[in-house]
Design a protein with these regions (language model features):
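Generic non-transmembrane alpha-helical segments
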Residues: 99-108, 130, 134-142, 164
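Short acidic (Asp/Glu) and glycine-rich catalytic loops that position anionic groups and cofactors
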Residues: 38, 77-82, 110-117
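Zn-dependent metallopeptidase/amidohydrolase metal-coordination segment
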Residues: 53-55, 60-62, 71-79, 141, ...
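C-terminal catalytic subdomain
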Residues: 69-97, 122
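Short glycine/threonine-rich loop-to-helix capping motif typified by GTGT followed
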Residues: 14-21, 123-132, 158-168
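Acidic-enriched catalytic cores of C-N bond-cleaving enzymes acting on peptides and small amides
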Residues: 1-64, 90-110
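A short beta-alpha structural unit
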Residues: 85-88, 113-128, 151-154
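Hydrophobic, well-ordered secondary-structure elements that form the walls
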Residues: 83, 135, 161
């Protein structure tokens, strides 16, 4: 339904940075995340690329029907789902909401009310920006190993700095 049409692919440099930042102990990462394998049985690096470059729709919660003690043989007349979107560069919150509505309508659920309670567009900062280079230099001077993540999974409100009207770089 067009969910991926404005997703900008990772550049060769972004892939290089992601590969360099990959934790060495894949099994420890799986343990922390509570998984036995990566989606579609992909290798660790491919899954890392997917995590950094593809938007997601996450179900935060579902409520419907009778949830009290005992049983009831009634059909629920109402259901709620709380979602969050994790957007990537070149996508917008408005576009994501419209695509969700179109997806629902195409499947016969055009009467579902979609309430948007917040959110923001994705953000990123160039690797060569002053703030990123200053942070890297400070870590290096302190003898601290660091990695540059060209994209993180999900959005964060840094767009208030990196988006119009300021258009400044911001670390995350």
């Amino acid at each position: 339904d067009g969910w991926f049409e404005n997703v900008r692919p990772l550049t060769p440099r972004e892939k290089e940075l992601l590969a360099a930042s990959l934790p060495k102990d894949e099994e420890a990462v799986k343990k922390v995340l509570g998984v036995r394998h990566w989606i579609k049985d992909e290798d660790f690096l491919t899954s890392t690329y997917r995590l950094a470059s593809q938007p997601t729709v996450n179900i935060q919660g579902l409520v419907s029907g009778y949830t009290g003690p005992g049983g009831k043989t009634v059909l629920p007349g109402r259901a709620e789902a709380k979602l969050d979107f994790r957007l990537v560069p070149d996508m917008t919150k408005t576009e994501a909401v419209e695509k969700l509505k179109a997806h629902l309508a195409k499947r016969g659920f055009g009467d579902i009310e979609v309430i948007v309670s917040g959110g923001y567009s994705p953000t990123e900062s160039p690797e060569n920006s002053v703030v990123i280079q200053a942070g890297a230099a400070a870590l290096k001077k302190a003898g601290i190993e660091y990695s540059l993540f060209p994209r993180r999974a999900g959005s964060w409100p840094g767009v208030v700095f990196t988006g119009p009207p300021l258009k400044l770089a911001a670390g995350h």
